[in-house]
Structures are given as structure tokens and as C-alpha cells.
């Protein structure tokens, strides 16, 4: 592999360096394994669609906590010298890039890459099994970073973010030539699909927002013939059952809330139920005007029911 190393001089420059490439942080989307990004979103992003570079609370937490995780690793693995990575690494032929969080020096095996993560307690237990394992999407990220930097090994440090106990787990990710070949093959296939205009199948659990980009408006008078779709009738029946169940739950919820209000009458709050905080207060809502806009509305009804 021919690898380019480009020094990072600022965040905007770094973001621009990443734009032409599939990067290690999202390569798992090509395997349907990324928790936030799908192959379709990646395809659209590299087909001219501009997405906001949102810096949400989770990303901000990870960025701010990154030095703390590295410090914790230094305390637990005193033989390692941890160095912040200041460069972007890319294979220009494959258009695959990576920026490891840190490099590890001082290990007898040679250079290592360190990926730092933070996790809420329930995520730490559910996805990381209490620090015993690394989620598949993170494994793919670290394997890509190690491959592009020609590191001897990779490691992941995850810090459980808890107000009273900042537990740290360090899990090594060995180089895996077969897995690395699969990563390279998936990236090469992705770029072939982009060039040929072959759109990946959507991930229905992640891609709802992409419909606003793909089909923001209907073409008046057009129809789509789904008579050959054998799966859809059963799914529509399933949806009908779910909607009926939701209506039943909502009706019962309203009954319980009405009963509670009658018991409270003009009281502002409830005492005597130590497990529950209940109040019924008046709230002033300012007048506001909703700006006009066109919104596509999906309506489904069973033709055998009125």
C-alpha cells in the first residue's frame, strides 16, 4: 500500500482532508455494523450530498474526554509512552483514510495505535460487556488505523463515564491480515458502486431521515406498482396490529392520568408516593406562528375497514 501522511494544522483542514475518503471511523458502515452511519448515507455523502457536520453531545464528550482517557491509560500501562497523533494517513489509490487518536511507543512489539472511547454505564455494560470486549465497529476502526499507519498492533481504551466511578478498560486488537483484506475489498467495491451509480440498500432502522434528501417531494400523478412484493402485505398487517396496540395503550394511559387528576383536584403536587414525583401545574405558553412548509405525509388504511 502506498500511504500518504499529511500533517494536521487545524480542524477545518482535517475535515477537508477526510472528505474524499472512506475513513476508519465509518468503515463499519460498509459491513452494516456502524451504530450511527449506514452504507447509503456514506454513498450519498460521496455522491454530492452535503450533510451537516453535527457536533452532538456524545461527540463533544468524546473529544473533551480524550486526553483524560489517554492519561488513564498512561497510569495503567506505565511502560507505554502515549503520543497524540498529529497526522492524517490515507491510501490515495483506495481512498481510505484514518487518524488514530494516539500512538503507543515503548512496546517490544513495535508501534501501536490507541483508539480512545467513552461510554455511559449502560452502554459500557451492554456493548462493551463491562470492558471485556470491543464492539465490532470499533474493531474495524482500529484495524484500519493500524493498517494505514503500519502499526504492529492496536488497542482500545474505553472509559465508563460515571459520576462516582470512572472505570477504564484496555483491550488490545491484534493485526488481522484476513480482516484487513476484507476491509480493503469492501472499500474498493464501495467506490465501484459510487462510480456506477449503484445505490446501497437502505437500513430502515437508520435511514428514515435520508428520505428527505432522496425524495423530498412526490411527482404528481405517479404510482409505484408493488404487486410483486410478497413481503409487504404481511408487514402492513403487522403494522396494523402495532397501531391497534398503541391506541389501546394510549387510551389506558389517558384513563390513568384522568383518574390521577380527579384525585388531585386543585392540588399542585402529590406526596406519600416515595417512588414517584407527580405535579400538575399550569404552564404559560407564548403565542407562536408555525412557518408554512410542505411536508410529505404517509397515510395507510386497510381497504377492508372503514
Question: Which residues make up each language-model segment?
Answer:
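Accessory terminal regions of nucleic-acid processing enzymes
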Residues: 1-306
